[in-house]
Amino acid sequence: MKQAQVMKQSKTGGGGNLKDSASGNHCTDFTNFERTADLKSSSLSKFVKNSTSNTAIPRILEQKQQLESKSVDKKQTQPLESHSDSENQAPTLFTQAFFARAGVFLFSFCTFFPFFSTLWVRRFFGKVDITQIIFHLRFPVAPNGVDIDFIFSFVALALLPSLAISLALTYPSGTARLFVASYEICARLFLWSKELVRSHSLIARYVFIALLSVYGWNYVGKKLKISEFIASNKVHKTYANFYESYYKAPDIESIKQSFSTIQKPRNLLVIYMESMEATFGSNDARDFAVKISLPFAELTQNLNSLASSGISFSHIRQTTGTGWTIAGLISYNCAFPQTWLPFNAGFNDSVARYFLHSATCLGDVFSALGYEQAFFRGANADFAGSRGFFASHSIPMNDLSSIEAYAQGFEDYRNDWGVKDSVLFSYVKEYLQEYAAKKDKKPFAFYVLTADTHAPGFVDKAYCDLPTSYANSLHCFDKIVGEFVEWFLQSPLAKDTTLVLLGDHLTMQQRFVQDSTSRSIYNAFINPAFTKPPTQDLLTERALSHFDITALLLDSIAIPTRDFGLGRNPLYERTLLEQLGESSLAAELSKPSRVYERFWEFDSTKELH
């Protein structure tokens, strides 16, 4: 009976196991913990039921405690091990992420900063190239030498956009995230792995930036003419013989002999007007890219009248190395361009002090002839090496540092660059009056450089009740310079003085003159004494460059001069621009020259002024 009950229980237990086994074939996703617990519980129950010995129970309890302790140890050990691994992996992952993002940021910034800087330079300074930029960077700039508005505009239009786009690509959000998200969607279709997609999204940003970099640097290279700069400054240069063929070195002794025959030497007063074009006197509104509130014929009415009543040569063209202020001044005074600054010429102080020291320029000629010379400008003369250039060629400088004390007697005497032009002309008037009062006077050669019409333009509210705009700055300056010329022509000095008005270069104000317009630099010779009558056929339909003006300046005060440097007197012969053509002359001027490099050498026979 007892055996029958045991067998019955055994069958019942066996049936239960079979049932569980059968149902297990239809169940899925049991955890290892659940399976282990079931097995341990089943084995323990079975063992207790079948056990007939009391000594087995302690052994069973001991085994149970050992199993439980091992389970607890395993649970405690696994998190500690994973925590330890995560601690080791965290710095590595952080370092990798940091350098990955830093790479994206630096790559982006090196792409966008040169691009936006080039756009800013061309907006405010026109079609400049890398030669001009490096040239200015190699000279010290005084704290008051640059208008603070230019610094703010550079930060706003070049630096901040570069930083913003670089950060957007480094930490995608908003518009930048759309690009990354669209890439991730496409990549997910083919890669299926989130980790691969995430790594490829970083690669996508690098690829995207690389494509932009190719476009950006190609734009920068073309606009700034970087390849031409590298070619002209490489170690093993191919020198051209252009200067050897066309440069006519001024013969000071010969000029002295011609000067000695003049009974009464004439004076010379030159006014270099910032960005002044003959184009501004056009009656055709189609020449301009803007609309202004007054007829274009009235924009520079006084200057138009002075050019008509005096002697004015048609079509002074701007060629290579003459398109910014110091380059224009060098070209007018030395009859060669400022094409590049040789790296073997030295840096900063040496170049600034001995600027084109071995070249013979207009100042050297007048110094040899015994003229009194002076240069007047309202801005700081240290900018772009201007002070060093004129000191190297015997012309003393009167700039912001010497004029500002006088200017403080005027209300609102400053413009964007220093002392405004109306105050500068007032200073020059007093200087000329003091000179006229002298008993023993030398002949003089004085030079004045204006700044009100430098882009984006300064409107002198004391003279013109007009809103600030570039067109209004031209109109207001026209009134200021017209009053000064009228005063001078009524002064006792006018009779023996040739007054010359020259634009220093074409305007740098973008989108003011139509690109299709034939542009030329303003010039007017008032009361000249040319050695050959300037008939109409010698004045019209001509093609002159800055270089030809040097010979004309000497000839206008009765010193016969057929050529000077690369300049040719258009009253006597055809200019190089007319002989070679504009494109050929520009190409030749861009080539390295041994003669030009020698101009930068130190001349021990000269004295600095």
Predicted region positions:
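Intrinsically disordered, low-complexity segments used as extracellular stalks/linkers
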Residues: 1-13, 40-41, 62-68, 75-83, ...
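Residue-identity detector for glycine
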Residues: 13-16, 24, 103
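Intrinsically disordered, low-complexity segments enriched in serine/proline and basic residues
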Residues: 18, 30-33, 39, 45-48, ...
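Transmembrane and membrane-interface helices of multi-pass
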Residues: 57-60, 85-232
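Short coil-to-helix leader/linker segments, especially the first N-terminal amphipathic alpha-helix
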Residues: 228-258
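Solvent-exposed soluble domains appended to multi-pass membrane proteins
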Residues: 251-609
